[in-house]
Structure formats: C-alpha cells, structure tokens
Amino acid sequence: MNRDSNKQSAIILAVIGILPVVWLGLLIAPSVKGGLPEILPSLLTVFNDPFHIELCGDSLKTVLVLLLIYGMGIGIYLSTRRNYRRREEHGSAKWGSAKAIDKKYRQSPPSENKLMTQNVRIGLNAKKHRRNLNTLVCGGSGAGKTRFYCKPNLMQTSNSSQVILDPKGEILRDVGNLLEKAGYEIKVLDLISMEKSHCYNPFVYLRNDNDIQRLVTNLFKSTTPKGSQSNDPFWDTAASMLLLALIFYLHYEAPEEEQNFAMVMEMLRAAAIEDEEDNRPSPLDNLFADLEMDNPDHIALKYYRSYHSGSAKTLKSIQITLAARLEKFNLESLAALTSADELDLASMGEKKTALFALIPDNDSSFNFLVSILYTQLFQQLFYSADHIHGGSLPIPVHMLMDEFANVSLPDDFDKILSVMRSRGVSVSIILQNLAQLKALFEKQWESIIGNCDEFLYLGGNEQSTHKYVSELLGKETIDTNTYGKSEGRSGSYSTNYQISGRELLTPDEVRMLDNRYAILFIRGELPVMDLKYDILKHPNVAYTADGKGGVYQHGEVTKNVATIETLYVDLDSVPEMELSETTYELLSDEDFENLTN
C-alpha cells in the first residue's frame, strides 16, 4: 500500500514539474540565439521580472528542448531507482521500548491492569487496545511463573473474578488474606485435604442432554492415562453407554439430593452379576423395567438397552470397566465432596469471586475432577454471557492455569480460546516449556499460541522452546568487518566493511537469558526484554505472606468423611428378652420343590 502511494506521489510531482520547465523555456527563448553567453545574463534579468514573457519564433523550440531534457532526466531517475530498505536488507528486527509499550497499553486506575514485567502493563479493558487478554507464560522450574506472574496479578485485586489452578495450595496460602480483604468471595476445591474443600457436584450443572454427553466424554478422557491406547475400544464405549443410562435416569427421575456420583456407584453395585449362569434380573434391571412401564421412550432406557444387549459375561465385563473408571468415587472423602454443590459456577461472572483448585503436585489421581470443573465452567460462563447478560459478563473472569499440563481440557480448547474474549473471559496458560503444549495438543498447539496476544518467556532449558523464541524474535541487519593480510615482499593489509543478518537472539543466547529478565511478545509490537516483576514493590504486598501479612487458612473441617465411634454398653442394664420358642423341620428335596413351586 505504501509503495503504491509513493508511486502516485512521484507521478503527480513529475506532472507538476512540467509547469516550471515551460515557464523557464518561455523566459529564456528570446536569448537562445546568442548562445550560453547571452542566456546566463538574461536569467538574472528575467528573475527580476519573472512574469514578463515575450513570445518569439524560438519560444516553441526552446520549450520543446527543455521538456525533452526534463523527460530524459525523469527517465534516468526512474531507471536507476531501486526498492531499497536501508539497514533492513537482512531483517528489521529490533528490541522495543518497555516504557513506550507501557504508555500505549496501560489504563487507569493502576489496579485495572495486567502486570507483564516490571515496566509493562496491559489494561484489562480489551476494547480500548484491541488485544485479547489471553497470555501464554512459559518458564522452567524455578523461573518464577508463580512469583513473578501469578501472585502479582492476583495482588492487583481488579474488578474481575479469578479461577486459579494452584498446585500445592501455595498461591491461596500467600494471597488469600489480601483477596478476602479486597472483597472477594473465596471458594476452594481442595483435592489435597478434601475435608477442607467446598463441595462440587457436577450434576448440578447438567442443563440438558448435551451437557450429560459432555460430562461422560470428559470423564472418560480425563481418566485415561496419558499415552495409553486401547486395542479394543468396545469396552470403553459400552461402559460409557451404561454410565449415560445411569446419569440420565438420575437427572430425570431422582430427587436432587440423589443426583450425584455416590448414587451412580450405588446403582452400579445394584447391577452386579454374581453368577453368569443366573438369569434372574438384578435390582437395577428391575428399576429400568419399572421405568419402561411408565415411559418406554425414556432416553435412559435407550442407553440401557444398548448396554444390556450382550451376554451376562459381557455385561459383567462392562460393569468392571465402568467400576474401574469410577473407582475413586468409592472413597468416602470424594463421595462427600461431590454429594452437594457450594461453588455456584454461574455466579462467577456476576460477583467478584476467587475460585482455587488445589491439586497435589506429586499425585494426579484426582485431577480428572478439575478437568470436569473447567469444562463445566466454560459452559456456565458462556451460557450466562449469551442468554442472561447480552453477550458479555458484567464481571470479567480470568483463569490462571498454573501447571496447565496437569489437567485434561476439551479437544476443542483452541476454539473455546478463540471465542471467549467477546464474553469477558480470558486465560493465562502457564507451562514449563512448549513441549508440554505440543504433547497435550499435537495438532492444535500453534493455534492455541496464535489465540494468545501476549507471550511471556521467563527462561528455561528446553531446546525446542529456545528455537521457537529465537525465530519469533526475528533477524536484524548488522555491520561486519572482514580483515585480510598477505605477507611477503609486497605484503598488504585490508579491511572490508559489509552488512549481514543475524538473529536478535540465537537459541543458545535464549538459553543463557539472565534469570532476572523476561522476554515479552505482544501482537503487533516489537519484542521487549525487561526485568521480571518485583513482587516486593507491589503496593499490596504488605497484605500477603510475602510481605509478612500472614498465611491464609482456609476451610475448617466441615465434613466428617468417615467417623467410627465405639459404643460401650453395660450388659447388666440390658433387660432380658423373652424369646419365642422356635421349631425346625428338615425337608426333603421333593418337599422343598413343592414349597417353592
């Protein structure tokens, strides 16, 4: 576009230049017969009275000659013109100014900004700077993902809700007091100490049949070990049909207090087949038989019939497969945690809430529940934005997903990421390296990065990440010198100056990044190398554990998950009971058959 504009400007200037050429030709025409000795003095006289033009027989000839010379000059200029980009021959990459970018993107008040580095902030009102607030944070162990990014942004206490994936519970412990003082309602899904957790029941958020399908799909995906492949998917498919039948039954037929995974396990135990040769119906079979009498087209029946079409041996194997998937719900602690719901996910876009999901950093056994939580949270927030609040949540929701690789998300997460901005939802994806992202989303990882307008690199040791950051920085044009020396009788010494290109940072230079610094990429801006944010300089640090503000203690024990009491009875105080006299009669096989027939 700039090239076309420059071309048009050159043509306009060339046409305008014809006017002074014609004017000059008319002025000097009366003097051309005397040659150059007369032309030069006449020019001085002519310029004293520039509009005194005398037409003569040589006027036309003089004008044409000057136009010819002018045209030749234009032609020579155009023939030698090249598309030069001085000092950019091998690349135009360069470092941006942290202060200049901060001035462009920061907003007032200071709390309504996302802290990227020590000197760069991005306002939370994305409509002003037209950048989404999705951020990819990449840093190895010890690079400061929690200290230099997660904690500072929670300390902002902005007018938004926060969903924090918190391995070990460190973030909640350090900033919980500050958030509580700032008016946040703190909720905790604690999978480390479940007796301290708020309850979370996925059944509460099942609005329609599609939600039930998503729940079962997510459950099976998140309980499948990474890298495992089933040679025969039949058993998982059949087990999912049985689970769908049970959940559909509870959703439409059971009272609310029975709609939970503990009841699913009760129903599954009621389907147990003790003897493969015994054709008697199980209690679960009887339950669905009653349902068939009342509503033969019930959706739960459709799935139950599909499951029940095999032999007794096959049904038993399907039950074992499903029981293995759900075995964690046999634990009293998890059954109690999922028996009711206290999280109220839909309200997160309506009032300031901080929801912490605490997961052990050395045990992923219960991470599947966090995966279900995230899937349902996206569904609830999107539904609330689209159908209740006119397209955008009144309170923005930001998800800080520390150790992102530890949870399983929907396969279409890249699509979810691309449409959440307009609804007031944003995500910070926090990884140790890009290899983790590639392992999770083999085909969509580049799309996920592309949907994050900010990329913050904190340092690390993973080679493919070094290469990616180096390529993202681009190449710059530099000056180089080459030296030559020849010895002998006619020895000489020479120095040559030339330009060449090199990466702004080579992969090995990325690896050697000073641990005090971070590299920040913002869409449409030059990259910035700046100091990581110093948490001790934040004005709210005094209210956190890092500023000696005390450690936050959450969740007094509210649920006695398993209680065993010893009852001491004084046997002497027990009244004697009169026992009725009982007689017994031994029957023959023939007599027994007559009684039972």
Predicted regions and their residues:
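Short intrinsically disordered coil segments
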Residues: 472, 535-537, 546-551
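A short, sequence-level motif marking secondary-structure junctions
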Residues: 203, 532-539
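Basic- and hydrophobic-enriched, low-structure N-terminal and domain-boundary segments
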Residues: 1-143, 147-152, 195, 475, ...
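Extended hydrophobic/Leu-rich segments
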Residues: 36, 40-47, 105, 486-490, ...
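Short loop or secondary-structure boundary microenvironments that flank
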Residues: 359, 363, 403, 431, ...
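Conserved ATP-driven motor cores of ASCE-family P-loop NTPases powering translocation/secretion/packaging/pilus
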Residues: 417-419, 423-519
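P-loop NTPase motor domains
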Residues: 128-425, 440, 444, 508-529, ...
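Alpha-helix termini
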Residues: 155-157, 179, 437, 472, ...
